[in-house]
């Protein structure tokens, strides 16, 4: 731990540096700290020895090191009031009637990326925490049909598919009966397991040839096991990081996995400063916030940017965005009221 005065100096240097991105000298600190310039320089030298400050190559000033930013986040970061113009911009962005969950989450991701000039990823409820609560097949013609799947009693999804050759209407009815009996009410982890174990054996009782039926099950259910993730500001990564990070952000399933790995089940928020095991994010900061999705669970909101970002503003922004999302999603699910299908 550092002394109270050293902590005050470190916090002030970080505040000034994140505003100007210029090295900070002792004279710039004197107006806020009641002590001599020599004492401030001495304390700055001690902070440098501790690895919390770094010398600038082009001036006599100091700038925070990655360790300094990390210390600040762990010991001094608090939620300040958000700028009124930021609050207005966040609230104004959601002044629209939403007809799909995806529209709300994609909008939140884009708004934050535009306001911060960094990258933002928003994750829906983790697939393994969702349940299959309803299933139906609607035959559209002699050649195609529509599978309607409902998750958590409030997230309908549809999958249109070509009816396999030699299939009769009663075969589609049998598939629905099998799903209702074996998969309905199960969480998606159980559904995935049963599709690999029980279902192939059951199909042998009712179908002479099962390969195309298994392929149909795979096609209908495969997207349920994928993370639902909305990423904005990918191109911004070329400015604050580089090509490796930009390419990594395009691998959205891996990105979702990395974000979840950085947050434990019991945490509501985390700030990782140069602390990711993923090489493309190792020298960056990730601010992740868990927000409520009414009736279903929690989603994750993650801001990815440089180590020298303005933590006070950005942490406050994602905190406010999380609250706005919870309100908007509550209104959305009240409207949905389990009476509407989402058609992709």
Swiss-Prot record:
InterPro entries hit by this protein: GAF-like_dom_sf, HrcA, HrcA_C, WH-like_DNA-bd_sf, WH_DNA-bd_sf, WHTH_HrcA_DNA-bd, WHTH_transcript_rep_HrcA_IDD
Top-rank lineage group of the source organism: Bacteria
GO biological process, one term: negative regulation of DNA-templated transcription
Pfam family of the protein (one): HrcA
Entry keyword annotation includes Ribonucleoprotein: no
GO MF assignments: DNA binding
SUPFAM superfamilies xref list: GAF domain-like, Winged helix' DNA-binding domain
Keywords assigned: Repressor, Stress response, Transcription, Transcription regulation
Physiological role: Negative regulator of class I heat shock genes (grpE-dnaK-dnaJ and groELS operons). Prevents heat-shock induction of these operons.
Entry's family note: Belongs to the HrcA family.
Record HAMAP family: HrcA
PANTHER family according to UniProt: HEAT-INDUCIBLE TRANSCRIPTION REPRESSOR HRCA
Name the UniProt record assigns to this protein: Heat-inducible transcription repressor HrcA
Phylogenetic placement of the source organism: Bacteria, Bacillati, Bacillota, Bacilli, Lactobacillales
Gene (UniProt): hrcA
């Amino acid at each position: 731990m550092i002394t109270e005065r050293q902590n005050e100096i470190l916090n002030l240097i970080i505040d000034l540096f994140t505003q100007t991105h210029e090295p900070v000298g002792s004279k710039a600190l004197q107006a806020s700290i009641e002590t001599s310039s020599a004492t401030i320089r001495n304390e700055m030298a001690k902070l440098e020895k501790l690895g919390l400050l770094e010398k600038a190559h082009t001036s006599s000033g100091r700038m925070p090191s990655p360790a300094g930013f990390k210390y600040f986040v762990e010991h001094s970061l608090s939620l300040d009031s958000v700028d009124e113009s930021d609050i207005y911009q966040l609230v104004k962005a959601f002044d629209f009637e939403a007809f799909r969950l995806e529209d709300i989450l994609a909008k939140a991701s884009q708004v934050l990326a535009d306001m911060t000039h960094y990258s933002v990823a928003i994750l829906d409820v983790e697939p393994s925490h969702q349940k299959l609560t309803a299933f139906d097949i609607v035959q559209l013609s002699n050649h195609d049909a529509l599978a309607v799947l409902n998750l958590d009693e409030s997230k309908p999804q549809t999958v249109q598919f070509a009816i396999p050759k030699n299939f009769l209407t009663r075969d589609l009815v049998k598939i629905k009966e099998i799903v209702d009996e074996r998969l309905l009410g199960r969480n998606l982890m159980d559904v995935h397991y049963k599709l690999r174990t029980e279902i192939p054996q059951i199909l042998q009782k009712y179908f002479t040839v099962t390969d195309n039926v298994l392929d149909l099950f795979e096609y209908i259910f495969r997207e349920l096991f994928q993370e639902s993730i909305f990423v904005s500001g990918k191109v911004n990564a070329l400015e604050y990081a580089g090509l490796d990070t930009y390419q990594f952000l395009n691998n959205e399933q891996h990105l979702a996995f990395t974000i979840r790995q950085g947050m434990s089940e019991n945490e509501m928020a985390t700030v990782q400063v140069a602390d990711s095991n993923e090489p493309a994010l190792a020298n960056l900061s990730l601010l992740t916030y868990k927000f409520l999705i009414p009736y279903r669970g929690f989603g994750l909101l993650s801001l990815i940017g440089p180590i020298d970002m303005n933590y006070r503003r950005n942490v406050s922004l994602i905190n406010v965005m999380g609250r706005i999302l919870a309100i908007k999603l509550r209104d959305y699910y009240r409207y949905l009221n389990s009476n509407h299908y989402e058609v992709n």
